[in-house]
Swiss-Prot record:
It comes from Escherichia coli (strain K12). It catalyses: alpha-D-Glc-(1->2)-alpha-D-Glc-(1->3)-[alpha-D-Gal-(1->6)]-alpha-D-Glc-(1->3)-[L-alpha-D-Hep-(1->7)]-4-O-PO3(2-)-L-alpha-D-Hep-(1->3)-4-O-PO3(2-)-L-alpha-D-Hep-(1->5)-[alpha-Kdo-(2->4)]-alpha-Kdo-(2->6)-lipid A + ADP-L-glycero-beta-D-manno-heptose = lipid A-core + ADP + H(+). This is Putative lipopolysaccharide heptosyltransferase 4. Keywords: Glycosyltransferase, Lipopolysaccharide biosynthesis, Transferase. Its EC number is 2.4.1.-. It comes from the Bacteria. GO terms for molecular function: ADP-heptose-lipopolysaccharide heptosyltransferase activity; lipid A-core heptosyltransferase activity; lipopolysaccharide N-acetylglucosaminyltransferase activity. It is an enzyme of class 2 (transferase). The lineage of its organism: Bacteria, Pseudomonadati, Pseudomonadota, Gammaproteobacteria, Enterobacterales. GO terms for biological process: lipopolysaccharide biosynthetic process; lipopolysaccharide core region biosynthetic process.
Amino acid sequence: MRLGTFHKKKRFYINKIKINFLSFLFRNKINNQITDPAQVKSCLIIHDNNKLGDLIVLSSIYRELYSKGVKITLLTNRKGGEFLSNNKNIFEFCIKESTGFLEMLTLCKHLRDLQFDIVLDPFETMPSFKHSLILSSLKDSYILGFDHWYKRYYSFYHPHDECLKEHMSTRAIEILKHIYGEGKFSTNYDLHLPVDVEDKIKEFIGDTRIVIINPLGAKKICRLTFEQIKVIYQEVKTHFENYRIIFTGLPQDLLTIPILEIETLPFDEFIYTVALTKYSDFVISVDTALVHIAAAYHKPTLAFYPNSRTPEYPSHLIWSPNHHKSIQIVSPTYTVKDIDTETLTNSVKRLSCIDKK
């Protein structure tokens, strides 16, 4: 066993022990249902990781709860707060600036003082003692959660999709049904953009048609090779004549692409990429967040996914594009660099047949 793997497993088991110990000190009272949905006026949603895709996939929750008169507070990091800052359905943000112990205690006290009617812990995580600290500080609120590591902290543990066979967006329906009972709820993604950002992008695009290529994700397993990028670029030029091809991603990554005179956005902030997606015609991406943004705006999309490392967590299934105009290509291995050239060329051809203007 490699040393890094050993230390990862050691942290895993130490966190499990600490979580279970803390749960006995601050065990939540079990209350299997909300007796009066009309009394739910304030809600905390816990989303304190770096995954923007999670925020997008459950964005319907913000809209649906707001329509019921619920004031939503979102616990997230600075990146998530900036991304959702223009969403008028969210009442306020609590930003987790640090995971330092003293900072976490201060955050926990602040959350406890706000006194929420309901707390939603909608995502599964690896065992985290800091996460259990947050939950233990909210024991006076009704906590609806989906992560089996924290069952003892919840008022109600929801076993939705324990076998991980459904898309994550279906969880929004389960949350709303738990609070309000059976009813018609929309799981359409709900994104909000600043007017000035949209205006700048519309001016930048003009009357041109746009194909976005996002070839280099934040994770190593979501980064195409330069040869793969060249293949995709040439195929797009062939099948999308008279379209502008705009590359998006981190500026420092885009500088490394060995293609002369590629076009990129003149804006660094990610919110401009979101706006560009809204006004684009086609999207090609390895970035799951961008794939879900494209789904929010019903854009024909070619999405490249790594295969899951373990069958127990089929990430390419539960975080799939979730849109009928999307083509999902799953690598035969856990990295997209192993998608072969024939698959790349054929998938671009297939994309060109969807709603082409």
